[in-house]
Amino acid sequence: MSSSEDEDDKFLYGSDNEEPKNEKKRPREAAEDDNEGPTSDKVVSQHNNDLKRPKLAKDSLANASSDEEESGSESDSDIEFIISTGPDPHRLDSSTVPGSNNAIVTVSEGANVGGETMSKSTATATTAEISTLNALGDTEVAGTSELDNETLGPETTTKSGTSAEGIDLDKEGLYNDEPVSTIDPEVLKEKPWRQPGANISDYFNYGFNEYTWMEYLHRQEKLRQEYNPRRILMGLMTLQQQGRLDQPQGGHQSMPDNMAINNPQPTNNDNMMHKPTPPLPNFPMPPMFGGFSPFMPPGMMAPMNRMPNQNQNQGQNQNQNQNQLSK
């Protein structure tokens, strides 16, 4: 039993007396070379290699200098990239702006552009593409400027034909070559402001609508008919002749001025033509309320009672005088 277990252990785990055979046998020639050491032929070849190394260094330096000379000679034939931004197509005066926004970029052959080495063929292809794009951009801008000029017309351009004029806010709007203030909305066949969903402010400004606008037009027409410059001028001349143009701003004259205007003083001719009126006779006031005048103070009662007696005495005196003269 023990022998079988030992054999199983050797098979599974290996024997303790055996050594691992990891080394490989070297070739016979290599072993012989190690035993013999370096020969004379190897020494000579190594010496020749050492002599050739400085020559190779000199050749590499010569090649580097020749490459620099060639690059210097080829610098005259460097590729130039002309990148034109072109005029702005959104501007009206883009057609007159010269193509001055050009950026010239010189790229030498073998230069590192964008992390890649630029070769001669690649640079040539890139130049051709840029020139094609510039030509297309110039053509598009020219077409856009011509279209703008045709659309705007000569009225909205200045003398140079490049910039548009501003909007005249004082000019009255026209509709079919007629002023809008003379058009009655009822005459129009189409009334888009009556359509559902229409914005009335797109057709009437300042808060007007169809009815208030018609009322405004009728009122303006009435004012034009009533306005008569000649009549206003004649009224001003009349006021100037009467001296009323120098009145105060309030329009109210002082009391003496009003009296002088309403009651002018008569001249000499007026005095001759108009005689003074005779004075009214003094008739006694009739007695009221039992012989007493209303609201009469007591002191005034005695003279009124004496007035008939005085008249009687005067009449008697006159009669006596006449009798004496007759005698």
UniProtKB/Swiss-Prot annotation:
Signal peptide: none annotated. Keywords: mRNA processing, Nucleus. The keyword Nucleus applies. It is found in: Nucleus. GO terms for cellular component: mRNA cleavage and polyadenylation specificity factor complex. Residues 66-79 have a biased composition (Acidic residues). InterPro entries: Fip1_dom, Pre-mRNA_3'-end_processing_reg. The keyword Nucleus applies. Its main location: nucleus. Residues 18-30, 49-58 have a biased composition (Basic and acidic residues). Residues 1-102, 136-167, 245-280, 301-327 are annotated as: Disordered. Transmembrane segments: none annotated. GO terms for biological process: mRNA processing. Residues 154-163, 245-271 have a biased composition (Polar residues). One of its GO terms (molecular function) is RNA binding. Pfam families: Fip1. Belongs to the FIP1 family. Pre-mRNA polyadenylation factor that directly interacts with poly(A) polymerase. This is Pre-mRNA polyadenylation factor FIP1. It comes from Candida glabrata (strain ATCC 2001 / BCRC 20586 / JCM 3761 / NBRC 0622 / NRRL Y-65 / CBS 138).
